[in-house]
Every structure is written in C-alpha cells, then in structure tokens.
Design a protein with these regions (language model features):
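N-terminal hydrophobic/helix-forming segments and targeting peptides
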Residues: 1-192
Length: 192
C-alpha cells in the first residue's frame, strides 16, 4: 500500500549559532505520515525499511487529518491573508488596510523593509508559517492551535499587542500556542 508522508529536519536557519551542522545528516531526517503513534502507523502496515518515493503534490494524510505539501513557508501565510482580504472586501473599516506578500524574508527581510518604508504602518501583522517541531520535542504541535510568536531574535511583541491577540483568541474560542522562535519573521523589519 501507498501512504503519503513528508520528510523533515530542523531547518538550517534554526540551527544558526548552535554549533550544529548547517546541512542535516541523513540520520537527522524524519518521515512523518501524520500518524499519532507507532501503533497507528503499524495498524496501516507501515514497517521499518519501507520504500519512499518523492512526490511534491499537496495531498491529505492517510488518516485524513492533515495536509502534506512542500514549501509551506510562506505560501500558507499568503493563503490566510488573501482569505482575510476576501472576507473584508466591501466592508467599511475604521482604518486603511494594506495587505501584501513580502519577498526574501530568509535573506534579510528585504521585502518587509521596502513595504514598511513605503506604507509606514502603525500596526504590522506578520502572518508566517512557523514550524510544528513537536516531532523533535520542541514547541508547536500540529492540531493544538495557531502559534502566537511573542519573541524571536529580530522582534519582541509589544505587551499591549500580545494582550490584544490573547484576548481576541480567547473571546473567539481560537486555539493558540505560545511560541518563542529561534528564527525571525518580517516583523523584525517592520518595528524599526
């Protein structure tokens, strides 16, 4: 039988400054088919030594609970922001709203520098795709809610913004996780 899976490892930009290798060793690569336990994987017939064949399409996991796709970062954020823009279309707002997709975040926040210089926003929300690192015993578990990134090396969220987001999530019944990141987002350029 065939089951979709995704390969993963700790991204190189999250190991920066740790003294660890910048390219993962083969033994550091994990394959995740979305099963919640070894027993569940075995119940589907998965065994050590099974053959893996690369596939880059977007698909559901065998248990139907998750989506597998390559390069989520930052496609997921763009999808969320475009859906938000559609839902606000035609509504009267008490402010000016600019929605964009910045480029070259991983190599110096270049797009964010350009857009924040041009528009000089009073509030900037960076919608990004943070890693679900629960496989590696770290923070960010799939299915446990959105990650509220309150700190990363390039940005510390203002306390009032953090309180606003927490209150909004709690009042709306939105599941969230606290997230302290090793890598940064476009918010690092926006707050300067």
């Amino acid at each position: 039988r065939e089951y979709p899976a995704i390969s993963g490892s700790v991204p190189p930009h999250l190991t920066r400054g740790t003294g660890g290798p910048t390219v993962p060793a083969i033994s550091d690569i994990v394959f995740d088919a979305g099963f919640s336990s070894k027993a569940e994987a075995e119940s589907y017939g998965v065994r050590p030594g099974d053959t893996l064949v690369p596939d880059s399409s977007a698909i559901l996991t065998a248990n139907g609970k998750n989506v597998i796709s390559k390069a989520w970062d930052n496609r997921y954020g763009v999808l969320m922001v475009s859906e938000l823009a559609k839902s606000l279309s035609g509504q009267a707002l008490n402010n000016e709203l600019y929605v964009g997709a910045n480029v070259q975040e991983e190599v110096g926040l270049r797009g964010a520098h350009t857009s924040t210089t041009k528009f000089d926003p009073e509030i900037f929300l960076a919608v990004d795709c943070s890693p679900a690192a629960d496989v590696f015993g770290d923070q960010g578990a799939i299915g446990e809610g959105t990650l509220l990134r309150f700190y990363d090396p390039g940005h510390i969220m203002l306390p009032n913004m953090k309180d606003f987001l927490l209150t909004t999530a709690e009042e709306a019944g939105i599941k969230f996780q606290y997230y302290c990141a090793k890598g940064g987002t476009d918010a690092g350029a926006a707050h300067l």
